[in-house]
Amino acid sequence: MAERRVTVGWPEGLHARPAAVFVRAATASGVPVTVARPDGEPVNAASMLSVLGLGVEGGQEVVLASAADDADIALDRLAKLVSEGLDELPGAV
């Protein structure tokens, strides 16, 4: 399973708008991705309610993971989005 540990770059954490940006990007990745606190259970990264339920604050670490064969590119892009607190997925049209 491919995995990336990243620090959340959005000051407000994975709440409201940043969570929506992240969920859209996870859905658009085309691979099943999970997100979790380092010591917590993973949740579906494409589920807004699940992501909000994590209660992740800015500056906290999360673990992105996927067992898909082609997960590395998707995880790298999502990790960049989360760590840099971007408003959209890098390379999005």
Model-derived segments and spans:
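C-terminal structural segments of small proteins and small subunits
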Residues: 57-93
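Short acidic, gly/pro-rich beta-turn/loop elements at beta-sheet edges
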Residues: 16-18, 74
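Predominant activation on well-ordered alpha-helical scaffold segments within soluble catalytic domains
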Residues: 20-23, 79
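Amphipathic, hydrophobic secondary-structure cores in small proteins
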Residues: 14-16, 23-24, 29, 34-69
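Hydrophobic alpha-helical context, especially transmembrane and signal-peptide helices
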Residues: 4, 44-46, 76
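Short amphipathic
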Residues: 1-10
